[in-house]
C-alpha cells in the first residue's frame, strides 16, 4: 500500500505508544522507515515494546521516555531531551484515559483524571513541539486520535467526549494558525477498535464482548488496528500535504447510522453500574502496579 521507504529520515513521537493502537501506529511508521520515540507512564512496558520492534526491524531506532503528560513541566523536559538528540518531524497524540460511568457518579477528581490527559496533555505535547518547529522553521505534522463522539456526544463517557471535542477544535484552530509555518494538524476519529487496555474500562462486563458493536455497525464488525495504522501513515505522509485541519472518521459508517457507542447501556441498573465500577477499579489497580 505504501512505499517501503515512505518515512525514511523521519522521526516521529507517539504518545501512549507502548501498547494498543499507539503501538500499532508506531510499528507502521518504523516499518516504513521512520525512527520513533514513544512515551507513557509505564517505563517497563515502553522498553519491552521498543526492544521487540527494533528486533523486528533491524537498523531502526525506537526511543522511550516515561512521562506523565498531565504535567506540563515534565512534558517540556522530555521534549527538550528529545530535541537535544534530533528534532522531531511529527507528533501523534494518542495517549488517553477513559472509563464508563454514570455522570452523576463522577467526582471532580475522576473528571480531571480524564481531562488532564486527553485535553491538557495533548495541548502540552502539541505546543511544546510546535513552538520548536516554528522557531526552527521546520515543516512537521501533528495527528491526534479522537473519536466519533466529537460530533455526536456520548452518554457515560462525558469527560472524554468533552475533552476529545476540545482537541478537535485545537486541531482545526492550529491548522490555520500554524499552516504558514509548514505545520499540518489533522485528526482521526475511530469507532470501536477493541484493545486490551481501553476495553477493560469501556466494556468491563464483557457481555457479548464486541458483538453489540458488530450488529450496530453497517459493516458488521469492529475496526482492525492495522486499518487505523494505515490511516495514520497516510495522514502523516508528506504526499498529502494539502490535507490540513481535518477530522476523519474511521468507523464503518457507524456514526452516520446514528448508533452512539454506549447508547445500549441506558438500560443498565444501578447494580450493573456498581459491578462496572468495581471491575474498572480492579483494572486500574493492576495498571498502576506496572508503572515505573
Specify the residue positions occupied by each region the protein language model found.
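Short, small/polar-rich loop/turn modules that mediate ligand/substrate recognition or access, typified
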Residues: 92, 179, 184, 243-245
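Active-site helix of classical SDR
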Residues: 126, 163, 171
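Alpha-helical segment proximal to the catalytic Tyr-Lys
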Residues: 131, 176-180, 241
Amino acid at each position: 500500500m505504501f512505499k517501503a521507504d515512505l518515512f525514511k529520515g523521519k522521526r516521529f513521537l507517539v504518545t501512549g505508544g507502548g501498547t494498543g493502537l499507539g503501538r500499532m501506529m508506531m510499528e507502521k511508521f518504523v516499518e516504513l522507515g521512520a525512527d520513533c520515540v514513544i512515551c507513557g507512564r509505564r517505563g517497563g512496558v515502553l522498553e519491552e515494546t521498543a526492544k521487540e520492534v527494533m528486533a523486528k526491524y533491524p537498523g531502526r531506532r525506537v526511543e522511550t521516555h516515561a512521562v506523565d503528560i498531565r504535567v506540563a513541566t515534565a512534558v517540556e523536559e522530555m521534549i527538550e531531551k528529545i530535541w537535544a538528540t534530533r528534532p522531531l518531524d511529527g507528533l501523534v497524540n494518542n495517549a488517553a484515559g477513559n472509563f464508563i460511568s454514570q455522570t452523576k457518579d463522577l467526582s471532580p477528581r475522576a473528571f480531571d483524571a480524564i481531562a488532564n490527559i486527553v485535553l491538557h496533555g495533548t495541548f502540552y505535547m502539541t505546543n511544546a513541539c510546535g513552538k520548536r518547529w516554528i522557531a526552527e522553521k521546520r515543516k512537521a505534522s501533528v495527528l491526534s486520535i479522537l473519536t466519533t463522539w466529537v460530533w455526536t456526544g456520548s452518554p457515560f463517557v462525558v469527560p472524554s467526549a468533552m475533552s476529545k471535542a476540545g482537541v478537535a477544535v485545537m486541531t482545526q484552530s492550529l491548522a490555520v494558525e500554524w499552516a504558514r509555518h509548514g505545520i499540518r494538524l489533522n485528526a482521526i476519529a475511530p469507532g470501536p477498535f477493541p484493545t486490551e487496555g481501553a476495553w477493560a474500562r469501556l466494556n468491563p462486563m464483557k457481555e457479548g464482548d464486541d458483538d453489540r458493536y458488530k450488529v450496530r455497525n453497517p459493516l458488521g464488525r469492529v475496526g482492525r488496528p492495522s486499518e487505523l495504522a494505515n490511516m495514520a501513515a497516510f495522514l502523516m505522509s508528506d504526499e498529502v500535504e494539502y490535507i490540513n485541519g481535518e477530522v476523519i472518521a474511521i468507523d464503518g459508517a457507524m456514526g452516520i447510522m446514528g448508533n452512539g457507542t454506549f447508547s445500549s447501556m441506558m438500560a443498565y441498573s444501578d447494580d450493573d453500574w456498581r459491578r462496572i465500577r468495581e471491575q474498572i477499579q480492579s483494572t486500574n489497580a493492576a495498571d498502576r502496579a506496572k508503572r515505573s
